[in-house]
């Protein structure tokens, strides 16, 4: 049988690390001490190894003293001082509280077989003392009754002196408890306890005597513990170390001592953490926290029940509470859902000091310095003051934001499509330029130019030019940052996750070697960059110059404005127009349209010239690229940062839409010839000029693609589609596939934004189902063009569905005669679509629409056709009984006649409450079957989207068992099967109001027809209307003026044609006499005709005036020649031909008389024509509605 050895605790404690820790020197993490006695105490790290057991010896005596101070706190005799000293290896601890009772201990005397007194038992008998069985509300730091005995068992000698007010007890213990001298007991009125000891240093790994460094380290550590105790006992008890009082009598003083070196002058946040129930409420905790970016991990000092504990649930509770506050504040501040912060992040910059007493805790760990208590004690009973958490959280979040900014500075991404210049980052880095190409086609052009080699030896090459792709688009960095002002007043710019992860912009940062924490004010800073400049190489269109280049400029202005100031940001200004003249090899190049226009006006004719536009870099042919790169430096222009640029960058790219809206209410002021000459002369472009011209033009163009013009209710894309349709289907209105027609529009109307979006616009322009945007589509759809089921999203592929022009409607709503009078968009020098139409009726208020753009929201609800017809007719017809009333209303900007929302194709109800109309769906209830059948939905609510919205509503689905959709493309039949006994509960929970009943409320069968009447103006910019009447009133003068222009132009053309036809008839009559066939040439014949008074005429202009204005007709029609006579064929000189011409003249004269009459009619020229056209439009609409917009 194996033998079991039995040893007493004394011998075991000598040899083992039980309770005290290692008995030899080891590296102790976080060991600190106070080495200075200056006015400002400072805790410093101790880097040398030390013995944990030795420190435990000293610590046990100190904790015993603070336990005694706490125990006497409520007694008559309090502890007023604790004196700790350490000199030449001798440690001493004394307090003036009631001494240890000096009485014989009967049990110990029987065991020792001699007289043993209580002080000896307390200091020499293991597992003996008052800490063996502690009460639940005990706040002593001592445990197990072994602390003082550990000190004795590891000491060469120790002297215990105590006085209880009657007697004084002195006893010496030698040789590690092996020799216990008899005590000396004498009368005394004193009260105190003092223990002096000399540890067995040699056995614990120290020199004997202590070396100078060992003495210094141990003294510093003991001094630190004395300072901790001073904070723990607080006022009323003075802690002395080597006879000098410790000046750390508060938690704030202790926190300052710890952080004075690492974070001097930092704000110390303090608080008292109180509990709400006994025994915890009797002992509030004092906490001090220092927040500083210099701290890299969470650190704490906890003096709980006098013990310097290394961890515990109280710390966990504090960290979790801080973390919750930090996360909440962080998300509120940064407003970036992708940015997350963790417990480690939120607490990594905090140093916390916690001092106080916690009842009922247990001490765990080898050295009994780990606090253990149920965590729910803190959650349930303790609360941290909100003011403390708030102030500290602000400081933490400020540091987190700063750290994010610095951390993101080193974000690495894979840089795609980058070719490094050979000298980039080297000694000649400042001579290198980074060419930032808009996309792949631009990269191809640059590569061609940079690899010309021997054919262009002095030109740019990869030696000093690098290339990078901008990917065709750039993120707006201005909207991806948060500017946060810290408590110290510093502004921190925090980039969100999207921006820091953006491969294009981050790639530019890496390639250039940019640093977000550097301003680049000095040449020394700029010399660290890998390139001397960045050159934007973008297309000469609105997307390239206005958008992409503007965003690149905004990016540099946001983070490195000094680089723009010092000419670092440039652009490659390529020719926009080249004019090739016959017989000449070198073209005339223009960089701005204004330059070309000014040049063209000076030319007598451009017949022998070929004009080519180059809006895209890919349009330049290889031989043109070679020519460009021979003069490359002359095409590189530098941006300058002028005074107004900062505000304009904020307006166009910042987050304040109201500022941008005010700026975009007006159109672009084009560059003057003087401005373009100035730009070329110095090759410098002010940023403000670029923003006010190119960027503004892009923004306005984007608006016109998203928000309709109030004159025709159309966006630019829809207008291109209509113009393309009129042209495409003019001769043959046979159906065409959507994708084929889209190609025609892109080609003839110069649509540059992709076939997918164009095809989608064509499909929408042909959709005709309940709830579709267009009540009056301009196209007839053949095939599946979508339904209300998915809101039109279920349309077929553009390859399979076809369209025709809704010609009967188009011809009446947009009279062909108007097309010659409208202003047109010119793309690449060619006429495209009108800038706007002016339809016979105000289409802008006849259809539905919704879209946001640049801070504006556009929402319209179609108005009732009958009301619109009544209003327009009343305006036009002077005999209309409401004519005078309407004109009075217009003049005084009031509303009289109704202009209600349209209810066409809608089986629900429209009701008005206050200033808004509401649309209501309909339903039937079968109480027996417990089913509600929805038979109509509110206006413009798609079926599937509606059902999904109900299913997502948890409080509604509580009452619903099943939803079944039996709806067709024309009708609504949605069965809502209720759970048993739900109907009464629904009526009870979803209260009936004046505006809706319970079922309408429950099933969301009502929507508000709230409008945002923001439209594009004829000359660009946005106009904000307050009512549909205002739109109508604004539209009326444009349509009215068009009739006068139409009649006046027709009048001018008729007069010219009558002049020409009359001259021809006269010539026929006199042709035999004139006998022009006998003359040698046309010049001689023309002289004869002139001498006989025949007018020279511009025959082509008179026959086909097309887009010529009245002024142009009057100027050029009579400045022609005699071709109209000299080109007459023999059969045209016959009497029958002459007779036909005379009849034609009579008809033209009759029409001229009619036109003159129309010009004089009341209330304005052409009023009767307008009324006729209104009738024709109404007739076409009725036919379209009766035929499901098929017109057959």
Curated annotation (Swiss-Prot):
Cofactor(s) this protein requires: Mg(2+); Mn(2+); Ca(2+)
* Family annotation (InterPro entries): DNA_Topoisomerase_II, HATPase_C_sf, Ribsml_uS5_D2-typ_fold_subgr, Topo_IIA, Topo_IIA-like_dom_sf, Topo_IIA_A/C_ab, Topo_IIA_A_a_sf, Topo_IIA_B_C
Name all Topo IIA-type catalytic domain ranges.
707-1174
SUPFAM superfamilies attached to this UniProt entry: ATPase domain of HSP90 chaperone/DNA topoisomerase II/histidine kinase (SSF55874), Type II DNA topoisomerase (SSF56719)
Q: What class of enzyme is it?
A: isomerase
Name the source's superkingdom.
Viruses
Q: Any idea which residues are catalytic in this one?
A: 800
Q: What is the protein's name according to its record?
A: DNA topoisomerase 2
Q: Which organism is it from?
A: African swine fever virus (strain Badajoz 1971 Vero-adapted) (Ba71V)
Taxon lineage: Viruses, Varidnaviria, Bamfordvirae, Nucleocytoviricota, Pokkesviricetes
The gene is TOP
